[in-house]
């Protein structure tokens, strides 16, 4: 798996998580700066298997 950061048609930075076969698994909202988008990716990368899942 790997993350991609890209600029969309509206000029916002977005991230997407892709599987080894290059299919999109997850994607995030648009950010006005590349730094904020990278921060979101870094937060996701810091999660662990112990991170809880909550049903709402």
Swiss-Prot record:
SUPFAM superfamilies, A to Z: YegP-like
InterPro entries: DUF1508, YegP-like_sf
Top-rank lineage group of the source organism: Bacteria
A Pfam family reported for this protein in Swiss-Prot or TrEMBL: DUF1508
Similarity field: Belongs to the UPF0339 family.
Name of the protein: UPF0339 protein NMB1088
Upper classification of the organism: Bacteria, Pseudomonadati, Pseudomonadota, Betaproteobacteria, Neisseriales
């Amino acid at each position: 798996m790997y993350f991609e950061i890209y600029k969309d048609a509206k000029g916002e930075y977005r991230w997407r998580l892709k599987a080894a076969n290059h299919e999109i698994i997850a994607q995030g909202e648009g950010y006005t700066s590349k730094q904020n988008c990278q921060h979101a990716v870094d937060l996701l990368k810091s999660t662990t298997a112990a991170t809880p899942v909550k049903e709402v």
